[in-house]
Amino acid sequence: MARMFYDADANLENLKGKTIAVMGFGSQGHAQAQNLKESGLNVIVGLRKPFDEASEKEWNAVIAAGITPMSVAEAAEAADVIQILLPDEVQARVYNAEIKPYLKAGNALGFSHGFNIHFGQIVPPAFVDVFMVAPKSPGHLVRRMYVKGAGVPGLVAVQQDYSGKAKDLALAYACGIGCTRAGVIETSFQEETETDLFGEQCVLCGGVTELVKAGFETLVEAGYQPEIAYFECMHELKLIVDLMYEGGMSYMRYSISDTAEWGDYTKGPEIIGEEARYAMYEALQDIQDGSFAKGWLLENMVGRPRFNALKRQNREHLIEEVGAELRGMMPWLKETK
């Protein structure tokens, strides 16, 4: 069974007196930095110096949160603990140019995703600790739950333990952002990276979007109205996922009709059959042997031509046009944003 840690297992004193630099102020960065500050820790934020309206707005948002913004290099030089929350595809470049030159013996490097460490894009020196604290929710929820006095579950891992206290630091960090209120599971950089990518590709993002599109297209091509197809294959998905999120698959099945449950048992395995499972296995192999990471890094090196083409192609799909029209009839959706 997985090993779990809670508030009682963590000691914030392990971070007291240290300067924590959070690199980035995006989804996770803004949440983690503010939570750490409100936990009584000394936090700074590393960003690009303002050069346009967007970067100036981000810089000012850090100031408005009562935190000192600095350039990434300045923050790295001032910090004892450096939490890198930049996009995967830019982390290595920024690390090599603006963080690595300022590392000192006994510093700690933190991450919330293991991509760059696991795939060798960032190779830390032997004289630093390397740990991961990965909240299992978007940043806005990390922040919202902390403010409510609660927290979101997370993962914790140690890749390199120079000081002999890397795990204590990781647990203190998890406590500082509120994750140990809910509980954190011990893992490894390899396990977190490979399972996270697999979940995104085969289920949460790639799997779900292709399943929804395939269902929508099947109904439309069979002569049904696109609006009806949208409701059946896209809109109602949230209702089912919310039930599973709340109480698992059994609770979802308890909550639906017997007709729907029978169709679930008998037709689901036909749709997600051996061919789909084999494709999942192949996707996992591509992740494990580094093929996916290599392809994604190369795509970024050449300016993302395929990524941008696929993004444009999917934005122009009929389901997006129909969905935008139907969501315009649902004013309550705007109230939840």
UniProtKB/Swiss-Prot annotation:
EC id: 1.1.1.383
Cross-referenced InterPro entries: 6-PGluconate_DH-like_C_sf, KARI, KARI_C, KARI_N, KARI_prok, NAD(P)-bd_dom_sf
A GO molecular-function annotation: ketol-acid reductoisomerase activity
Reaction equations catalysed: (2R)-2,3-dihydroxy-3-methylbutanoate + NAD(+) = (2S)-2-acetolactate + NADH + H(+); (2R)-2,3-dihydroxy-3-methylbutanoate + NADP(+) = (2S)-2-acetolactate + NADPH + H(+)
KARI C-terminal knotted domain segment(s): 188-333
Pathway this chain belongs to: Amino-acid biosynthesis; L-isoleucine biosynthesis; L-isoleucine from 2-oxobutanoate: step 2/4; Amino-acid biosynthesis; L-valine biosynthesis; L-valine from pyruvate: step 2/4
Positions bound to NADP(+): 25-28, 48, 88-91, 139
Binding residue positions for Mg(2+) 2: 196, 232, 236
One BP annotation, GO: L-valine biosynthetic process
Ranges for domain KARI N-terminal Rossmann: 2-187
Cysteines joined through disulfide linkages: none
Positions of substrate binding: 257
Annotated Gene Ontology cellular component terms: cytosol
Ligand binding (Mg(2+) 1): 196, 200
Cofactor(s) the protein needs: Mg(2+)
Family, as annotated: Belongs to the ketol-acid reductoisomerase family.
Full protein name: Ketol-acid reductoisomerase (NAD(P)(+))
Gene: ilvC
